[in-house]
Every structure is written in C-alpha cells, then in structure tokens.
C-alpha cells in the first residue's frame, strides 16, 4: 500500500478500504478458497452422485427446456453458471459486504473504534 493509497482510503467513501482490498486481494483469495469449495462439490453425496454432477445434470435439462419452443415462449433463459465459480464469487461478495459494513461503522461511530490505532486514524474524521 502506498502513502497515496492510504490517504485515498482515509479521505474516501465509507467503503474505501474495503474496495482497496477487493482490488488487491480478490485474486489471491479466489486461489486460496477455490480448492476448499471444489472438494465438497465433487464429493459423493447420495448414490455416488456429487453436488457438481447434480448441478450439471440440472442445468443440461433446464437448458433443453429453455431452448425449446415452449421455453422460449415462456421467456425462460438458459443457465451458463459454473457452480464452483458462483459459490466462490458469492462467498467473497458476502465477506467483503461484511467488511464494508464494519468499515462504515468504524468511520461513522466513535464507539466502533475499539483500538488505539482506529481511534488515532479515524479520530479526526467526520
């Protein structure tokens, strides 16, 4: 983090630090968590079928229906979602959402600044 980055975060929006971390850590976090998501998705659950296999079969059948005349008439859309990617994206989104909520609280609520460092950094803000 550069000095300029720090100033932009300090003077920025209620989620400026969170956005910085989204930009700087998302790729590394994805690489770290992907195996932890992939493993249970590929684990056999019932009758030797995994969640990933069930999802693949479900999307194949759904896309057949959505691509049919009836599906098109009903306005159904095909699904092109990779389950592993979707779960990973939503997990990171949720994590950063909670971080942003906490950051906003720290910036706007003196009582949320529970450490001397937070008090010093944000004490002169707002």
What is each stretch, according to the model?
Residues 23, 27, 31, 35, ...:
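Short, residue-level hotspots on alpha-helical faces of the histone-fold
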Residues 36-92:
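An amphipathic alpha-helical core segment
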Residues 84, 90-126:
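A cross-kingdom marker for long, charged
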